[in-house]
Regions:
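Acidic, surface-exposed loops and disordered segments
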Residues: 1-179
Length: 179
């Protein structure tokens, strides 16, 4: 396991993947990590659908107007869903879980990219969440937050440029008081 700051420096959104499958062992490691995600009152409102079938990846890559085509080239997609009855902060809980999935993918040497679904529309104006729900037979009582595309990186991105850290957004004691 790498140092957390190093993981944060090197983890970048990857939108181009090699045509390489991910072993079942690595998929299990990804899920192992995400299932340890913290949640409010340990409510664990999240559930995850692992999609590896190329035809379904292609269909998911059309779930919104912009920013989802990369799913078609991924080895797998993890559809992040939640039961809002379990927690009134389900959005925060699934967002934390999704980010842990990104960090674990990076730690395993894989690339990943978040594709927002909730509150998005397809190119022809349909609700993206409803489209994904229909494709994957997700019950109406569950919400679809996002899809995390994962695969072997086919692009190299520079680490995060720490000269871009916005220290002016850190306030000490009170708003407006900075370093």
């Amino acid at each position: 396991m790498e140092n957390l700051l190093e993981l944060l420096r090197t983890r970048r959104s990857i939108r181009s993947f090699k045509e390489t499958q991910i072993s079942p062992e690595l998929v299990e490691q990804l899920m192992h990590a995400v299932l340890m995600s913290p949640s409010s009152k340990r409510s664990n409102p999240w559930q995850f659908i692992i999609v590896e079938e190329p035809g379904m990846l292609k269909s998911l890559s059309e779930c919104k107007k912009y920013g989802c085509q990369l799913i078609d080239g991924a080895a797998l997609a993890v559809v992040v869903i939640a039961d809002p009855e379990c927690s009134n902060v389900w959005i925060e809980d699934v967002s934390i879980a999704s980010f842990i999935l990104h960090l674990e993918a990076e730690d395993l040497g894989l690339g990943s990219c978040w594709v927002q679904v909730r509150e998005r529309q397809t190119a022809d104006g349909k609700d993206s969440e409803a489209v994904v729900r229909h494709l994957l037979d997700i019950p109406e009582n569950l919400r679809v937050e996002s899809i995390v595309a994962i695969g072997v990186k086919n692009e190299v991105k520079k680490p995060f440029d720490e000269t871009r850290l916005q220290w002016e957004k850190v306030h000490i004691g009170k708003f407006g008081q900075t370093k």
